[in-house]
Amino acid sequence: MTKETETTCSFCGKSQDEVGKLIAGVDGYICGECIDLCHDLLHDEETREQQSAEEAVETEEKLPTPHEIRAHLDDYVIGQDYAKKVLAVAVYNHYKRLRSNHGIADVELGKSNILLIGPTGSGKTLLAETMARMLNVPFAMADATTLTEAGYVGEDVENVIQKLLQNCDYDTEKAQRGIIYIDEIDKITRKSENPSITRDVSGEGVQQALLKLIEGTVASIPPQGGRKHPQQEMLRVDTSKILFICGGAFAGLDRVVQKRIHKGSGIGFDAEVKGKEDEVSLTDLLKQIETEDLIKYGLIPEFIGRLPVVAPLSELDEKALVQILTEPKNALTKQYQALFGLENVELEFTPEALNAMAKKALERKTGARGLRSIVEGALLDTMYDLPSLEGLVKVVVDEAVINEHSAPKLEY
């Protein structure tokens, strides 16, 4: 005769002798130890959900107003008041949309992707970077001239999403709240207003490839930067939640706008002699940009439709460049002074030197971007010798250092 079957816990398999009590269910038993374990697991899950909810509420509370966004941009970017205001409103509306969509019935809020138009070194990239840093969201940057359609040699447009994922350790939720800045967007314009019969791999074709990405699609991205293959599990990223900012110099676009405004007046834009007063009006001219102007320039209508917010930036003058050198929180002169301070040496730039640097940047037509190379060139030899110079107290950079490549004055 066989031994009577011993009653055991259906979860852990322990006998009644080992656990003391078993609670009977319809088709099985559970012991006190397993009940405690289940309770702990459920409690941990509840705690995690509560923490996530609290973090979400905390994040929502931290969404800065357009005034606060503008004030923060003022700390790091000189001038460009109109562009800052446009950006502040667009960014606020975008993140408000993400946080409020679940509570809006029968209304779908559109995306506020942004097009920045301004000359080299006017602050387009800095504005985008500063906003991402302020909002504490992932940021990625791409150069439109390196992008090609899928299947061609070059960088696939979806690689832009991969860069964003890399910058937030492949956390898709974080990536979907990020900002992507695509520079040199004016370099992928088509060469004529008529659709091309031949394939345009790096121009109109790239605009077409970017369309869905910018408007909103679910992109499949290989994990950890691998290549796509059929059996691979992909990361799915909803790009409708990502804010896209496109920037470009759009040289000559002002002529297109001027031609439209003064159509039939018989006065050619090229015939005008532009003085200082006219230069101010060029910024106002770019505020009047319409879709037809961008189409004439070479952007396709569908692409323009995905960038509803247009923010023009003005060219920086000498005064603005001097302010950029000295006033922002991370101003170039402050950075180099901090660097010299690590060697217990004071670094001084004379007002004449600052003006000379600004003039040189204007001559090179590099805007604020060219200032760092000018300062670096002026201080290279001094920085090379600095750790070896005992007793050095102060370094003075004057106008001669910038214009005549003289050595800075050393004070011991």
Swiss-Prot record:
GO CC annotations, alphabetized: HslUV protease complex
Highest rank taxon of the organism: Bacteria
GO biological process, one term: proteolysis involved in protein catabolic process
Residues the record lists as binding Zn(2+): C9, C12, C31, C34
Residue span(s) of domain ClpX-type ZB: 1-50
Positions that bind ATP: P119, T120, G121, S122, G123, K124, T125, L126
Family note: Belongs to the ClpX chaperone family.
Classification via HAMAP family: ClpX
UniProt name for this protein: ATP-dependent Clp protease ATP-binding subunit ClpX
Gene behind this protein: clpX
